[in-house]
A protein has these predicted regions:
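Intrinsically disordered, low-complexity acidic/polar segments
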Residues: 15, 62-64, 148, 158-161
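Mixed-charge, glycine-accented linear interaction segment located at domain edges/termini
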Residues: 158-187
Length: 202
């Protein structure tokens, strides 16, 4: 499955949540603790590229109770523009749950991967039925970056027509949240966190 996702800054979290409750359904509260491991490898054309994997410790609270998971993820990312130049993410994500991260961490270190980033994210999640499947809407706090909204729809394909239709749907949902398109953020969290670290070290 391919994730098609839009991310935007949230200037007023309380107003956003009040707006979401008028058209979307609350699903969960989640705490995510992410550890990114990266390695530089030689690609087919002999250029160097970075590959990374994520180890996520997730605690999810729903009406049924609390669920704790360890999730191993490999994700290939792209940035796609809409006709109006709005940028969204297109991600090919592969993941599985594991009982213990210790063996994976040892394997990664022995294979030359290094810990490149640690990210924490607190999430309040909502769902909305659309003509393109369920939209997952998450109101996120990512220290020290602040609050964001992420809107995601999964697709079995990534052909141009499907991607454009879903991109347009994501923008419509953002408009229903009364968040301006000027607040859309095309940078990855990892990029913003590294920039924040550099500023803090100056």
């Amino acid at each position: 499955m391919f994730e098609i996702e839009l991310k935007a800054h949230v200037r007023n979290r309380e107003n956003l949540i009040a707006e979401l409750k008028t058209f979307a359904t609350y699903e969960k509260t989640v705490e995510r603790n992410d550890f990114y491991y990266g390695k530089e490898i030689e690609s087919e054309n002999s250029t160097l590229k970075n590959i990374s994997v994520r180890l996520r410790k997730e605690s999810k609270k729903t009406e049924q109770g609390t669920e704790i998971k360890n999730i191993f993820t490999y994700k290939q990312k792209e940035i796609k523009q809409t006709a109006s130049k709005i940028e969204t993410e297109l991600n090919d994500e592969k993941e599985c749950t594991v009982s213990d991260f210790a063996p994976i961490e040892e394997f990664l270190k022995d294979s030359g991967f290094i810990l490149t980033l640690h990210k924490k994210k607190s999430v309040e999640g909502y769902i909305l039925n659309t003509g393109f499947g369920t939209a997952n809407i998450e109101v996120c706090n990512v220290p020290p970056l602040g609050d964001f909204i992420e809107i995601e729809i999964l697709s079995k394909t990534k052909d141009e027509k499907t991607v454009k239709n879903i991109q347009n749907e994501l923008v419509k949902i953002l408009q229903r949240c009364k968040i301006p398109e000027s607040d859309i953020e095309s940078k990855y969290y990892s990029e913003m966190l590294r920039e924040a670290q550099e500023v803090a070290l100056r």
